[in-house]
From Swiss-Prot:
Keyword Hydrolase included in the entry's annotation: yes
Start and end residues of each Nudix hydrolase domain: 6-149
Similarity comment: family membership: Belongs to the Nudix hydrolase family. RppH subfamily.
Motif mapping: Nudix box: 38-59
Protein name: RNA pyrophosphohydrolase
Cofactor(s) in the UniProt record: a divalent metal cation
Keywords, alphabetical: Hydrolase
Annotated source species: Psychrobacter sp. (strain PRwf-1)
Length: 173
């Protein structure tokens, strides 16, 4: 679904373990890594889309995870001009995303799989919470930063989480 401003409605998933690490996945056929994400279908709520994408991209059911939080508002990013398909109608100039923070208990890591009908990822690893900011493609960095900062307070941690840019303590648990 593309809105009147040209932004495609989408969900992003930050899947965290109990150590505060997040699932970081490599796209099939590319040397690029990202969080699971995907479009919202017609008539679907962002929450429904998130659970569908969780299954389609990572092989997890709602029973495998605990929903901790979601961003309050849509977070937007514009696509670089070279990625805009000018012959497409309606024209998509970027994405607007609702982000969800989920907790995966360690016993459920065995359920993570990519052998789905249309695999989008072929490898995954647990990385530190802020690691994706320096690794994701440049045009998504602002959205990743806003989503990670907004959702960080909901992480169930046994240690401090420090903002990468400032070295300030974000929270102490």
């Amino acid at each position: 679904m593309i809105d009147a401003d040209g932004f495609r409605a989408n969900v992003g998933i930050i899947l965290a373990n109990t150590q505060g690490q997040v699932l970081w996945a490599k796209r099939v056929g590319h040397d690029s890594w990202q969080f699971p994400q995907g479009g919202i279908d017609e008539g679907e709520t962002p929450l429904d889309a998130m659970y569908r994408e969780l299954w389609e991209e990572v092989g997890l059911y709602p029973r495998h995870v605990q929903l901790l939080a979601a961003t309050d508002n849509w977070l937007r990013y514009r696509l670089p001009k070279r990625y805009i398909r000018h012959g497409q109608h309606p024209l998509c100039i970027g994405q607007k995303q609702k982000w969800f923070l989920l907790k995966l208990d360690e016993p459920n890591t065995e359920h993570i799989r990519f052998d789905t009908a249309k695999p989008e990822f072929d490898h995954w690893e647990w990385v530190s919470y802020w690691y994706p900011l320096g690794q994701v493609v440049h045009f998504k960095r602002g959205v990743y930063r806003r989503a990670l900062r907004e959702l960080a307070r909901e992480l169930p941690l046994k240690k401090e989480l420090i903002l990468p840019e400032t070295k300030n303590h974000l929270l102490q648990v």
